[in-house]
C-alpha cells in the first residue's frame, strides 16, 4: 500500500486541527473560572482594607497608610509575608489532617461562588438546585476545621474545632429553612430565577419585605457561619489562644485568614441574591420608568451595570457585618447554642410553615 506525501500532510493537518480545538476548548473553560477567582481575590483584598479602615474609624485611630495609597496594598503585603514564612508542622500531630484541613475550608467556599449570579448573564453554573448546592458544599467546611483541630494535637486547637463544628450545625439548620422559604416563594431553587422573581416592582419586590423574619434569621445565621463577632467562639483569643489556628503558620495560616473573608463575601452575596433583588435596579417603576428599563439592557453595558448594582448591595451588607464586629461583645458557648436551637430554629420553622400556608392558599 502506497501513501503519498500529500495524504500524510492532510492527515497531520487534520490531527493538528482537532488538537487545537481541544486546547482552545480547555482554555475557554478555564477563562471564566480564572476570571471569577481573580475577581474574588480582589474582593477579599477590598474587604480586608475596609475592615481595617472601619475599625480604625470606630476606635478613633489611624488605619493602614504606608503600604500603597491609603494603605490599599497592606493586605497584599501581609499575604506576601505569610507566603514566605516557615511552614511548621506539629511533631506529635497528624500531619496529613493538619495539611488537608485548610485546603478543604478554602475549596468548599470557592466552589460555592459558582452558583452566584453577578448579572443576568454572568454566572458560572446556572443549576436548578443552585441554592441548595451552596448549602451542601458549605456544610463541608466545618469538617476541614475539625480535621485541623484534631490533627494539631493541641487541646486549644481541638476545642476550637469542636466549637466550630457545633456552631456550624446549630446555625446551618435555620439557614437552610430560610433558604427553603425563599425557594417556595420563588417556585424555584435556581439563583437566577430567585432574582428574576424579585424584579417586578423595584425594591418593593424584594424578598426582604415578603420575608422579614426570615431575613433577620438568615442575617444572624450568616454571621454565625462566618464566625464573626459576636459568634467568634471557635477562635476566642482569651480562651483558646487562636482556636483551631493555634499551631498554624505561614501560608496555611493565611489560607484560614482568606477563608474567613471568602465566607463573609459569599454570605453577603447570597443576602443580595435572596433578599435584596440581586442585580436589579432598586427604583420602583412608578417613580422612574426610564431607570427601570436598565434591567432590560443586554450586552456588556447591561452586564457591567448588573455587576455594579450587585456589588453595591453586597458591600452595604459587608459594612453592617464589619460594624457589628466592633460593636457587640462575644457570647458564651451556652448562649450561642441556646440562640440557635431554642430561638432561631423554632422561628425559622414557623416562618417556613407560614410561607407554605400562604403559598397553598394562593393556588
UniProtKB/Swiss-Prot annotation:
EC numbers on record: 7.1.1.-
GO cellular component terms, semicolon-separated: chloroplast thylakoid membrane
Membrane-protein topology: Multi-pass membrane protein
Keywords: Chloroplast, Membrane, NAD, NADP, Plastid, Plastoquinone, Quinone, Thylakoid, Translocase, Transmembrane, Transmembrane helix
Membrane-spanning parts: 30-50, 98-118, 129-149, 248-268, 300-320, 343-363
Pfam families the record matches: NADHdh
Localization terms from the record: Plastid, Chloroplast thylakoid membrane
Purpose: NDH shuttles electrons from NAD(P)H:plastoquinone, via FMN and iron-sulfur (Fe-S) centers, to quinones in the photosynthetic chain and possibly in a chloroplast respiratory chain. The immediate electron acceptor for the enzyme in this species is believed to be plastoquinone. Couples the redox reaction to proton translocation, and thus conserves the redox energy in a proton gradient.
Name of the featured protein: NAD(P)H-quinone oxidoreductase subunit 1, chloroplastic
Lineage, opening ranks: Eukaryota, Viridiplantae, Streptophyta, Embryophyta, Tracheophyta
Gene: ndhA
